[in-house]
Amino acid sequence: MPELPEVETVKRGLIKTIIDKKIFDIEINTDKLRYPIDKDQLVKIKNKVVKEIQRRGKHLIIFIEDDLQLIIHLGMSGIIKVIDSTNYNKIKHDHIVVTLSDNLSLVYNDPRKFGYWLVNTNHTPLEHRVLVSHGVEPLTADFNSDYLVSKLKQTSRKIKQTIMDNNIVVGVGNIYASEALFDSNILPTRASNTITKKEAANLVSSIKKILEKAITQGGTTLKDYKNTEGKPGYFTQQLNVYGRNEQQCYVCNTKIQSLVIAQRNTFFCKKCQK
């Protein structure tokens, strides 16, 4: 699933290519992604200009003139490509194709159809039902040790579950949660309310560092993810624990272990993490 760094990479690619472009047409090739597609709403973006693009957690928000916003989630396997319209040949799972000025097309391909495209018309996209409960952004000053400690002391659930809770902090997905916990030497199975303030400070620092490094590498490609140019992310080459079950830890040579926490595969080093 595309996580925060991957969505941030897509956002930056879109900013470079589609800002100030006019939307000439939108072709919808499916009736349903995660939610049924409201074609009457989507056609409202036709003949409008793209003004701004933001990210909120794992969502893209595309601001369009006349106070319209597209809220897009890539789901498990969604890819957005910006290509030359004259060279476009439709392939399987191209569910939405937006034709833009300057011979550009924005193509949304999603084999598993867990993503969604929603149109917001009330001028306040952050109050939309899919965004309103989001917690703080991890790369902002609002995400700090005092904030995290205040949340951790309220729950005994495993620390990995807590830092992946979008109501607390958005966008720290499965890959980066495992990597940040390794970087801060904290076992993913620790009860949240046992984490000390010093450990919380280290964890906040690790989350920020890991996410920022992943963004500079264009995200992580395990299977499906590609950026707007169709290129993979290269952070896979820097993963210390994720996906490395039974391989030697780069730090201590102990074998990496895995277990399932809240239905998500979790990777850790029993020696380095306490």
From Swiss-Prot:
SMART domains: Fapy_DNA_glyco, H2TH. The keyword RNA-binding does not apply. The keyword DNA repair applies. It comes from the Bacteria. It catalyses: Hydrolysis of DNA containing ring-opened 7-methylguanine residues, releasing 2,6-diamino-4-hydroxy-5-(N-methyl)formamidopyrimidine; 2'-deoxyribonucleotide-(2'-deoxyribose 5'-phosphate)-2'-deoxyribonucleotide-DNA = a 3'-end 2'-deoxyribonucleotide-(2,3-dehydro-2,3-deoxyribose 5'-phosphate)-DNA + a 5'-end 5'-phospho-2'-deoxyribonucleoside-DNA + H(+). One of its GO terms (molecular function) is zinc ion binding. It holds the Pfam family Fapy_DNA_glyco. The active site is at residues 2-3, 58, 264. Involved in base excision repair of DNA damaged by oxidation or by mutagenic agents. Acts as a DNA glycosylase that recognizes and removes damaged bases. Has a preference for oxidized purines, such as 7,8-dihydro-8-oxoguanine (8-oxoG). Has AP (apurinic/apyrimidinic) lyase activity and introduces nicks in the DNA strand. Cleaves the DNA backbone by beta-delta elimination to generate a single-strand break at the site of the removed base with both 3'- and 5'-phosphates. Belongs to the FPG family. This is Formamidopyrimidine-DNA glycosylase. It comes from Francisella tularensis subsp. tularensis (strain SCHU S4 / Schu 4). The gene is mutM.
